Structures are given as structure tokens and as C-alpha cells.
Amino acid sequence: MKKQAVLSLSGGMDSSTVLLHLLANDYQVTALSFDYGQKHNVELERAAELIEYLNKNGHHVKYQRITLQGLVGLLDSNLVKGGDDVPEGHYEEDNMKDTVVPNRNKIFSSIIQAVALSIAQVRECDVDIAMGIHAGDHAIYPDCRQEFRDADYEAFKQGNWDADKVKYITPYLYGDKF
């Protein structure tokens, strides 16, 4: 049986390259994208296009776009419809803090963890959770830091039977885009 992974796939550069890395390392991947009312839907479109391309070219990636549209209007962020304009330019801490979506990666992680644990239990195997978070996000997004990932994983293990069958892969956690 192939190694199993559940990937948070935004459709951006980071998570897309993690997907390719997983496939190159012989993983069976379940990719999840989240539609939470973000203004830049182009990444979700790119995620679907990438999955379609890969599946037409010899890979088999299970893909699910999960809608969290009910959160629109409840979350305060410039990234979400109804918020102010999205800041442009380089990742500068002052202007990029407006792009923080409260608890976004925790919301995503809870869903991804549940899917990974379900796969582990049904297939009686270990499952890796893969994310494209990287060091360039640490100053801006607290939920992209190792300390957050560790605490979140510990809570997951405390709250679920067989959680030791699920591990994290974050290949870019200490790397930067530049």
C-alpha cells in the first residue's frame, strides 16, 4: 500500500509544490481546499486545474473543495469578502497583518486532522498531514509557527484515539520563498 497523505491545498505555490513532492515520493494524496469567502478565488481555481491535470496524466489525487462560506461576515480580515482592500506589495508585517484570518489554520487543521484520522482508521495505516506553511509567514501569521503546530498537534493527540497514526509534514517550515 502507498503511503497516505492529506494535504491542505490552497492552489498557491507553496501547497502546490508540496503536492508534487508527495507524489514524487509515492504518496496517495487526498487534497483539501477551503473556500472560506476569500477574495482571491483564483488560487482555488488553480488548485482544481492542477488536480485535473495531474489526474489526466497518470496520478490519482482525491480532491475535495470544502465550503466554509458560512464564515463570511463573521471573520474580520481584509482577505475575506466584505473586508477592506487586500494590501499589495512585499510581505511587510505592518500591512500584511490586515490579511490575518482569525484562527484560519486551526479551522483547516481540525478538518484535515479528522480526515487523516478517518483514513488511518479505515485503512489501518499511518497518515501524514502535509502543509505548505513557510518561514516567511511566521512574523505575520502566528498559526504558521512551529509552536502553534506543536500545540495544535498535542491537542489533536489528547482529543482522539489512534492520533499517533497521524503525523505532520511541513517541508518549508524553516525555509523562505526568497
Tell where the protein language model's regions lie, with residue ranges.
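ATP-dependent adenylation/nucleotidyltransferase module used to activate substrates
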Residues: 1-178
